[in-house]
Amino acid sequence: HSRGHRYAPENTKNLLEWLEKENRRIVNNSRALELEISKQKQIEELKKFEVNFPKTYFAVNKKEILEKSKNFSKPFITKHNRGGRGLGVKYFQNIYELKRYVNGKNFEDSIDGITLLQEYIDSDPKVITRIEFVKGKFLYAVQVDASDGFELCPADPCNVQDKFCPANSDGNKFMILKDYKNPEIKKYEDLLKSNGIEIAGIEYVKSKDGTHYTYDINTNTNYNSIAERKSNLKGM
């Protein structure tokens, strides 16, 4: 829906369920789609596989949003349960800033009526890591310069190729990491296998004390051709 196709998820769900009933070969089934369009379900899976994630609450109206925000004593963010490209993610230093936003004319509700409130993880440098999986197995990890905000879509149409990003040593917004190791990769692979997901990109942010906080499972993942060309690795 964030790319101008409001009912694409609903139509795709019907198609996938029909194909499943016909026992057709499917890469990323209807369960993969369920996770793609619900961050609430993603959190449930992360919890099930004991993957660390930011403190998170869910709200279904403005009153609940303000009430749940009282659980935070430090900066936090709000995001839509059905998101996409980081659109709709807002940063707040305190409940008073949130109250002005929620009661103002610029408030933007989630398309499914569910809003997440999540602790803000401060990182230095301002980067996140996206781990790509193909056939349910680790392929590579890409470091993403997040200094410009939360819209971190890796697809080529989303990016200005000649923009220099200082957080990555090669100057590109997306940089594939060499000799990458992460003890949670096995947990990620187990989670994907349990849900019948073959292709995915899982994102986490590392806090200043080195703790990993996983916050997103992308089952409609994209690849960045510049980063892949520089590393000689390909997702497709």
Residue ranges: model-predicted function:
Residues 179, 193-197, 206-236:
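C-terminal active-site "lid" helix and adjoining low-complexity regulatory extension at the edge
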Residues 76, 116, 139-140, 200, ...:
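Protein kinase-like catalytic core scaffold
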Residues 58, 133-134, 206:
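Generic beta-strand structural signal
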Residues 90-195:
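Phosphate-binding site of ATP-dependent enzymes
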Residues 1-37, 52-55:
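A short, GP-enriched loop/loop-strand-helix hinge that lies immediately N-terminal to
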Residues 202-204:
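Hydrophobic residue at the +6 position relative to the catalytic HRD Asp in the kinase catalytic loop
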Residues 21, 31-127, 179-185:
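Active-site nucleotide/adenylate-binding loops and adjacent lid/helix of ATP-dependent enzymes
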